[in-house]
A protein has these predicted regions:
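Non-catalytic C-terminal accessory region of glycerolipid acyltransferases
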Residues: 2-17, 106-365
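A transmembrane-helix-recognition feature enriched in membrane-embedded lipid enzymes
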Residues: 2-38, 70, 84-93
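Catalytic core of membrane glycerolipid acyltransferases/transacylases, capturing the structured
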Residues: 21, 45-102
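Short, basic, glycine/proline-bearing loop/turn elements
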Residues: 24-26, 92-98, 124-129
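Active-site phosphate/pyrophosphate- and oxyanion-stabilizing loops and adjacent acidic/basic residues
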Residues: 26, 62, 142
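A conditional alpha-helix N-cap/helix-loop micro-motif detector
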Residues: 33, 101-105, 134
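Conserved beta-strand scaffold positions in the cores of enzyme catalytic domains, especially
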Residues: 37, 74, 95-97, 152-154, ...
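Glycine-rich helix-loop-beta junction characteristic of Rossmann-like nucleotide cofactor-binding loops
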Residues: 40-44
Length: 365
């Protein structure tokens, strides 16, 4: 049997510090919000267990950390720094950083080590917040459950859309944490599924159980389906224009209409991508080119940034469009032409609502 000094993380750790922070966290939540927590009795008093929840804001990890009666070791984003004071606070509390979009065996070994010490692991199977309610479950939760033979406790978080901004504005939002009954640990049955497919089936079950604990009204806040399109025109100084086709414009439109991805680049990574935000203002060729180059610089360091968030095909198409558009911008600058991008987004909601957004990027030489 392994002893604690054989693991990279000795569980439990930072016990006194975390107890104090948890007390402070609960007090702040009562002051700044209206937390409603139910079902904590479903969390086993001992043994390895995985807490798995949905994720739409920066607040869910706080509730997952401070309310269970056992110390929770959280898995979090290691590919992006957190914003402002949150980055320092999270580092002080401690978590297991995972490089999303790339195979991070080291993080998974650390997480498995926590479970092998009969610990509690907190995880978000969707892996991010950029498309809540429509994202595919990542198989990491199934792999960890299988290897450690740990049950999974589904947790539904409700009322968290724009929750952090509401807290900062002292609006005291109602934040619900609903803990469900345990899902037995994953076991590989002798059926026709491959191991990969079996893991995905289990991860999908976990996410389904999580979503069943979320207030239905929350799903009305995000589109059930959306599509994107983009047209590109070159306009000469005399006013004549011509349509130009490049690969990946639809994927590029999806990227530009996803604020979470742009915010990650601008706020977390401090990249100069503000010219890419959908506004009606005219941009200068140099500014827009620098913004696109900043995206490529991130992809050089983290190749999975787009593919993890958009899917492999869409991510590669968006990257291709960025590279081709950058070349076209150089040509347009040298020939004194204006580039016009007409981007559209259509969204359909579960309650029958339809939304259309149109943004034009006018990029002058």
């Amino acid at each position: 049997m392994n002893t604690s000094n054989q693991f990279e993380i000795s569980y439990p750790r930072l016990t006194f510090r975390r107890k104090i922070l948890n007390l402070v966290g609960r007090a702040l939540l009562r002051l700044l919000a209206r937390p409603q927590v139910s079902g904590l009795e479903h969390i086993p008093a001992e043994g390895p267990v995985i807490l798995a929840g949905n994720h739409v804001s920066t607040l869910e990890p706080l509730l997952m950390a401070v309310y269970p009666h056992r110390q929770v070791e959280l898995i979090g984003a290691g590919d992006l720094p957190f914003e402002g004071f949150i980055d320092r606070l999270v580092a002080f509390y401690g978590f297991i950083p995972v490089n999303r979009g790339n195979l991070d065996r080291k993080a998974m070994v650390k997480a498995l080590g926590v479970l092998e010490q009969a610990g509690v692991l907190g995880i978000y199977p969707e892996g991010g917040t950029w498309n809540p309610g429509r994202m595919k479950a990542q198989v990491g939760v199934a792999w960890l459950s299988h290897k450690a033979q740990a049950p999974v406790i589904p947790i539904g978080f409700s009322g968290f859309h724009n929750g952090f901004s509401k807290v900062l504005k002292f609006e005291r939002p109602t934040l619900k944490m609903s803990v469900g009954e345990p899902i037995p640990a994953f076991r590989l049955d002798n059926d026709s599924l491959t191991v990969k497919d079996a893991y995905q089936k289990y991860a999908d079950l976990v996410l389904e159980r999580i979503n069943s604990l979320v207030d239905p009204a929350d799903f009305l806040l995000v589109p059930q389906k959306s599509d994107h399109a983009m047209r590109l025109r070159l306009e000469s100084e005399g006013g004549s224009s011509e349509m130009v086709e490049i690969v990946g414009l639809q994927a590029l439109a999806e990227f530009l209409f996803t604020p979470v991805m742009l915010n990650s680049l601008a706020n977390n990574l401090k990249k100069p991508v503000r010219p890419l935000y959908p506004t009606q203002q005219t941009r200068q060729n140099k500014q827009f080119s620098e913004a696109l180059q900043a995206v490529l610089d991130v992809l050089d360091e983290n190749p999975g940034f787009l593919t993890y968030r958009m899917g492999v095909e869409q991510g590669h198409l968006a990257e291709s469009a960025v590279r081709l558009l950058l070349q076209l911008l150089d040509t347009a600058h040298n020939t004194h032409k204006t580039i016009i991008l007409d981007a559209t987004m259509h969204a359909w909601y579960r309650d029958g609502r339809f939304e259309a957004k149109i943004h034009q990027y006018r990029i002058t030489p």
